[in-house]
């Protein structure tokens, strides 16, 4: 009888605590995109200005020179060496080519105005931070940057998805000083220019976009993208490995123009930073880390925030914004300092401030929206 009772006890244990426990059979690949957290880089393409250009900017806009004193290595290095899985690329409209070939700020530092860079003569979107004075970049064209991402992705097909945030820019020196003349005048990002973003992505990733996660992939046959993501509709990590997805950094009129004619982003490639309550809302850009981010994350939105800005934290060593960004559950925590500024070793103006996930993980289970099963495990 005792042996029979033992068998019954074992059987009941299996029934109630083993075989039917779905959590025990869950794997990391079953986590959804909104259930992880990664480190991102800000203005990821950017090379710091030369000393001479920095000094020129400081002579008329010292605060701007202070804010711009950072740079990044190649995207491939960011992905492989530092585990970055979210990047940001600024693009300017240049349908005829040559708009940014001349770097007119060079006139004031004794450098040639004509860049001599052939890629800048070709038609298409250009990658830079600011015409004439802050133009140094690892990738002159958007297509060059996309190829760099795709090539790395093809060589590392098991990577968790990379999110690329795109800012459509129109800024120039005239934006700072309207009375100035003779400098580059960027073009407006109208509907044609916004369509060019999608077209150039397709030119690199193919018309079928097999490697790209699009709003249509998430929305399916539903009328509202937001309703899908608020009901657990993001794809799993396993379904998304080796893929890329894109977001539009801009709000306001630029965002509205991108959405116009594409309800719930039907047919579009970029997720937009749209307001909760709209049919296209899925990705939120909340640059200032606050505790309220957790509320949006727990609802199902994917959020990008910043751990630092304008070099302030790297100079002061203040880790408060970084720590709040990480604990908020924002899926993308963007920084200029996934490695400390090298000048910290030789200058009192800089600290060893840096941003990484606990354990230097590439990705971790989200502290707010995760399942609770993999908090101590690295995800990649």
PLM region spans:
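Sec-dependent signal peptide recognition
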Residues: 2-11
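C-terminal motif of bacterial Sec signal peptides marking the signal peptidase cleavage site
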Residues: 16-18
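Catalytic cores of phosphodiester-bond hydrolases, prominently lipid phosphodiesterases
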Residues: 22-89, 93-380
């Amino acid at each position: 009888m005792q042996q029979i009772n033992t068998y019954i006890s074992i059987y009941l244990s299996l029934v109630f605590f083993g075989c039917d426990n779905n959590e025990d059979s869950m794997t990391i690949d079953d986590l959804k995109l909104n259930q992880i957290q990664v480190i991102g880089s800000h203005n990821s393409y950017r090379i710091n200005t030369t000393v001479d250009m920095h000094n020129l900017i400081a002579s008329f806009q010292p605060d701007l020179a202070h804010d711009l004193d950072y740079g990044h290595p190649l995207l491939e290095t960011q992905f492989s060496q530092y585990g970055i899985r979210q990047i940001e690329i600024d693009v300017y409209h240049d349908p005829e080519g040559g708009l940014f070939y001349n770097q007119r700020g060079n006139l004031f530092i004794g450098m040639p105005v004509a860049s001599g860079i052939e890629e800048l003569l070709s038609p298409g979107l250009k990658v830079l931070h600011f015409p004439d004075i802050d133009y140094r970049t690892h990738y002159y064209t958007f297509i060059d940057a996309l190829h760099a991402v795709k090539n790395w992705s093809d060589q590392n097909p098991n990577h968790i998805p990379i999110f690329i945030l795109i800012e459509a820019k129109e800024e120039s020196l005239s934006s700072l000083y309207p009375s100035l003349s003779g400098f580059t005048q960027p073009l407006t990002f109208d509907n044609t220019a916004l369509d060019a973003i999608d077209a150039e992505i397709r030119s690199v990733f193919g018309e079928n976009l097999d490697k790209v996660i699009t709003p249509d992939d998430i929305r399916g046959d539903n009328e509202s993208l937001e309703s899908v993501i608020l009901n657990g509709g993001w794809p799993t990590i396993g379904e998304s490995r080796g893929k890329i997805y894109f977001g539009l950094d801009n709000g306001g009129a630029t965002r509205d123009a991108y959405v116009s004619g594409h309800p719930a982003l039907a047919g579009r490639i970029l997720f937009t930073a749209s307001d909760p309550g709209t049919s296209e809302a899925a990705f939120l850009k909340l640059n200032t880390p606050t505790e309220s981010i957790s509320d949006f994350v727990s609802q199902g939105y994917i959020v990008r925030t910043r751990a630092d800005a304008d070099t302030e934290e790297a100079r002061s060593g203040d880790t408060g914004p970084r720590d709040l960004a990480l604990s908020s559950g924002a899926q993308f925590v963007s920084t200029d300092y996934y490695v400390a500024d090298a000048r910290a070793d030789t200058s009192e103006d800089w600290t060893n401030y840096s941003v990484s996930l606990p354990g230097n993980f590439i990705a971790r289970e989200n502290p707010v929206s995760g399942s609770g099963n993999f908090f101590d495990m690295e995800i990649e």
